[in-house]
């Protein structure tokens, strides 16, 4: 055995120490203060590569545009010096998806008044910036005649009575577009609302009429009525839905009076029947669009989950029937989901957990079904979503706001092409009100007072960029979730949501980001009223202007800011959302 000289031993030890130090430095999370200022040029080189547009988004991103972040007025915020509980790493070069603006949509309805005569409400909607506002009104769409007037609300072949889910005859109560009464919403004012709020539309045509119409060919007649609307629209609206929740036993046309039907339709709607009818509607509507030189996209309704054994007949096999018969006639598919158990007094955990689980479950269910039918995956639009919880004023609480922010992030991550929350305004119902604004019947609240969900979605768009990027949150527990983004103007952002009851200190490190001198953030928290479901939201500690909702001077509030000298540290309080943007160099 040969001996080793002292010089060789010394050199070997030095090399080993260097290697060990290098391994230690790169084997775990960076320590606070060791990020941006110590990056190599490669670490701060911002060269994002956009992935292909996912088929579930498709043409909804044809109108994609970059976002420019404008730094808000700010005051110095407190940077926590407590130990870090969670570490967030964000890679600006790893683009998950270019964010479709259409995921921020909302729903109008026919009972919230003419709206365009309400400048305060219009300003709130402009600030919310939904991009898409759906019409005419959920299930009412299947008893709505867009060209009806006071003198002639519905066609002569529309029956005076319809069958309900139990097969009982009930008064039809048709709605119509030419109704200019103050309590409803005319079609002309729907178009005016879109213009005043810089929004586009998504319109649901009356499919129910194809079922309950009494003429010799009700399907062709209903399709012709839809095509006439396309002509009247004259290119203003690109996105059209054939019926609302057409599988639903609550919808007009689910069950028809066979003694009045003249084309041999079955008593109950099926997926196969609807799929065949989709072809008729699509042909008529596309012909109308060609006549006006417009481009339109037509959607068909699918059921968004596996039916339970106890579900009624029409739901069983609905998707297979639609897909087999409609084929390639639809341009996109429509789903609705209200996330929590129907009419249940759901708790905080059930509500907030659903925001993550439901969008991914929908995609995991639908895509294989479409492919099994031998069809290509197409854009998927969730044109109604909210929570179904009742009994504790959950819908008007800040928990519904956290759920809204968490859901939008999940919808983007799961690559939906469109999403419209239900709805702009509805009715108090002792706090079971899904409306974003008070229609005027909430005790003690001002007319059109924004509910907490408004604030959570307003700041989401302010501080979420045009590209979702990869992030890696190493959380202390499952309560934490993050959604990160970049702006075309160069800034980086993240939204951190704490669904639990413990305070968290989160460190944030960026990769491939030439960081600037400052970062800005907002913290949204709830109040102490109404137990778990406070009707108040505080924005950076600023209290609501009234007994419920949030601060009405939200547009002029100052963000928190701090110097960006390395790793960012931010406190995320219990049951809160933090919206943060780091400036560019």
Question: Language-model segments: what does each one mean?
Answer:
Residues 2-12:
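Bacterial N-terminal signal peptides that target proteins for export
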Residues 14-54, 58, 63:
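Bacterial Sec-dependent N-terminal signal peptides
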Residues 48-328:
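N-terminal catalytic cores of secreted or lumenal carbohydrate-active enzymes
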Residues 111-115, 140-144, 210-212, 247-250, ...:
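Flexible loop/turn segments at secondary-structure boundaries
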Residues 270-404, 414:
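Noncatalytic carbohydrate-binding groove/subsite architecture in carbohydrate-active enzymes
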Residues 382-464, 468-482, 488-489:
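Aromatic/acidic polysaccharide-binding cleft in carbohydrate-active enzymes
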Residues 477-529, 575-581:
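Carbohydrate-binding surface patches
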Residues 513-568, 572:
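Acidic, Ser/Thr/Pro-rich beta/coil linker or hinge segments at domain junctions
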């Amino acid at each position: 055995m040969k001996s080793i000289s002292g010089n060789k031993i010394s050199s070997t030890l030095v090399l080993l120490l260097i290697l060990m130090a290098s391994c230690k430095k790169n084997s775990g999370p960076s320590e606070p203060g060791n990020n941006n200022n110590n990056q190599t040029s490669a670490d701060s080189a911002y060269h994002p590569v956009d992935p292909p547009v996912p088929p579930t988004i498709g043409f909804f991103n044809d109108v994609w545009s970059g976002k420019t972040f404008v730094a808000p007025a700010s005051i110095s915020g407190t940077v926590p010096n407590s130990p870090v509980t969670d570490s967030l790493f964000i890679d600006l070069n790893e683009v998950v998806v270019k964010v479709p603006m259409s995921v921020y949509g909302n729903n109008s309805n026919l009972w919230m008044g003419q709206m365009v005569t309400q400048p305060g409400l219009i300003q709130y909607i402009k600030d919310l910036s939904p991009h898409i506002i759906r019409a005419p009104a959920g299930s009412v769409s299947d008893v709505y005649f867009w060209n009806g007037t006071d003198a002639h609300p519905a066609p002569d072949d529309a029956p005076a009575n319809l069958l309900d889910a139990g097969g009982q005859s009930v008064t039809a109560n048709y709605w119509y577009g030419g109704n200019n009464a103050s309590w409803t919403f005319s079609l002309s004012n729907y178009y005016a609302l879109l213009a005043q709020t810089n929004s586009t539309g998504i319109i649901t045509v009356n499919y129910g009429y194809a079922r309950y119409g009494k003429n010799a060919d009700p399907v062709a007649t209903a399709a012709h009525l839809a095509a006439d609307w396309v002509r009247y629209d004259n290119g203003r609206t690109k996105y059209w839905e054939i019926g609302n929740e057409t599988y639903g036993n609550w919808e007009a046309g689910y069950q028809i009076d066979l003694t009045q039907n003249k084309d041999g339709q079955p008593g109950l709607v099926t997926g196969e029947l609807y799929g065949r009818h989709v072809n008729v509607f699509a042909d008529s509507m596309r012909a109308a669009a060609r006549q006006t030189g417009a481009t339109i996209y037509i959607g068909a309704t699918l059921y968004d989950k596996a039916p339970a054994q106890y579900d009624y007949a029409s739901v069983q096999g609905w998707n297979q029937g639609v897909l087999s018969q409609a084929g390639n006639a639809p341009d996109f598919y429509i789903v609705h989901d209200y996330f929590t158990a129907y009419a249940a007094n759901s708790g905080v955990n059930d509500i907030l957990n659903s925001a993550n689980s439901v969008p991914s479950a929908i995609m995991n269910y639908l895509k294989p079904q479409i492919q099994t039918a031998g069809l290509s995956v197409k854009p998927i639009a969730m044109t109604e979503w909210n929570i179904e919880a009742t009994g504790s004023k959950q819908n008007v609480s800040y928990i519904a706001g956290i759920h809204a922010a968490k859901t939008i992030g999940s919808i983007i991550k799961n690559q939906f092409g469109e999403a419209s929350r239900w709805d702009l305004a509805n009715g108090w119902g002792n706090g079971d009100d899904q409306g974003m604004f008070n229609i005027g019947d909430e005790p003690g609240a001002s007319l059109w007072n924004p509910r907490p969900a408004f604030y959570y979605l307003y700041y989401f768009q302010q501080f979420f960029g045009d590209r979702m990027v990869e992030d890696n949150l190493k959380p202390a527990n499952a309560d934490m979730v993050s959604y990160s983004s970049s702006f075309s103007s160069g800034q980086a952002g993240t939204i951190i949501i704490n669904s639990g009851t413990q305070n968290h200190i989160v460190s944030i490190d960026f990769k491939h980001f030439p960081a600037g001198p400052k970062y800005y953030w907002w913290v949204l928290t709830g109040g102490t009223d109404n137990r778990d479901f406070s009707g108040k939201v505080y924005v950076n500690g600023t209290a609501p202007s009234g007994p419920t909702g949030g601060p009405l001077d939200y547009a002029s509030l100052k963000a928190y800011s701090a110097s960006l000298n390395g790793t960012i540290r931010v406190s995320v309080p219990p049951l809160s959302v933090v919206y943060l943007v780091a400036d560019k160099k």
